[in-house]
Amino acid sequence: MAAALAATATGCVPYPVYKTMQPAARVTVMDTQSQPLSDARVVLISSSYPYGRERSRQEARTMPTGKATFSAQTEWRVESLMLHGSEIYFWNWCIEKAGYETYETLNNTASQFDDTLIVQLPPGESRSCNRP
C-alpha cells in the first residue's frame, strides 16, 4: 500500500497502453513522367519522443509497379506517467535510387506522416539513406 501511495505521489503510475511502433504503410515511387521505378530502396524510419531518438529502420525495394509495403508493428506495453510524458512515436521516409534525387521527410509528429505516399523522383544525384 505504501509503495502504491509513493508511486502515485511521484507521478510514476504504471498503466497498460497499446503502441504502434510502425504503422502499416505503402509507397508508390515514380519518375517525373509518372512511370513506376522498380528496385528503389525505401526506408521507413521509426523514432520516438520524449528524446526524439531513432528506434528502428525497415527497408523494402520497390516492385516493378513502383510499390513497396510495410506491415504494422504494434505491442502492448506498460508505461509510467512521468513529467516528460509518455513515449510517442513518429515516422519518416527515405527513398533512394541511383540516378534520381533522394526523397526524405523530416516529420516530428505522427500526424505529419503519409502512410500511402506517392512520390515522383526527379533525375539527379542520389544520397544514401544510411544513418549519418
Protein language model regions, located:
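Residue-level preference for beta-strand/loop junctions
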Residues: 21-22, 54, 87-89
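Short, acidic Ser/Thr/Gly-rich low-complexity loop/linker segments typical of extracellular
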Residues: 50-76
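Beta-strand-rich interaction surfaces with strong enrichment in secreted/lumenal proteins
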Residues: 14-16, 57-61, 81-82, 105-109
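Short consensus segments that form the blades of beta-propeller domains
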Residues: 16-19, 50-51, 81-85
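Beta-strand-rich domain onsets/edges
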Residues: 6, 10-24, 28-35, 43, ...
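Short, ordered, surface-exposed loop/turn motifs in non-cytosolic proteins
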Residues: 33-49, 64
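A short, solvent-exposed loop/turn motif at the edges and junctions
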Residues: 76-109
